[in-house]
Amino acid sequence: MKKHGVLNSEIASVLASLGHTDTIVIADCGLPIPAGVKRIDLAVEIGKPSFLDVLQVVADDMAIEKVTLAEEVINNNVEVNKEIELKLIEPAFEYVCHEQFKEHTKKAKAIIRTGEATPYANVILHAGVIF
């Protein structure tokens, strides 16, 4: 049994398979998941697990070069946007409109669906390198 890091076998496998610039998405329970993209559904009920809890665990285990968010989060979910900026202080941040964000999710290696039920609580994590 693993002692550290992500215990979910699907998430651990996706993280281990990422190459430089590959992307994964951590999403609220309402984000549409495109056909053909791996869905890792963690949602058990509204709010559980939370977007921020899942983001923290994944971020602790992943080299992140860039973060993409929907620009709508700035005004519509101030708390989540602030927490993302506090948790992810090193990567570059990019904001795009929500429609562009959804287009970008089509290229993700996986989308991790949380139980989060607040607006625009979604992030695309772009893999960096550890060297």
Curated annotation (Swiss-Prot):
Positions of disulphide bridges: none
Keywords: Carbohydrate metabolism, Cytoplasm, Isomerase
Gene Ontology biological process: D-ribose catabolic process
Pathway this chain belongs to: Carbohydrate metabolism; D-ribose degradation; D-ribose 5-phosphate from beta-D-ribopyranose: step 1/2
Superkingdom to which the source organism belongs: Bacteria
Record-linked HAMAP family: D_rib_pyranase (MF_01661)
Described function: Catalyzes the interconversion of beta-pyran and beta-furan forms of D-ribose.
This protein's name: D-ribose pyranase
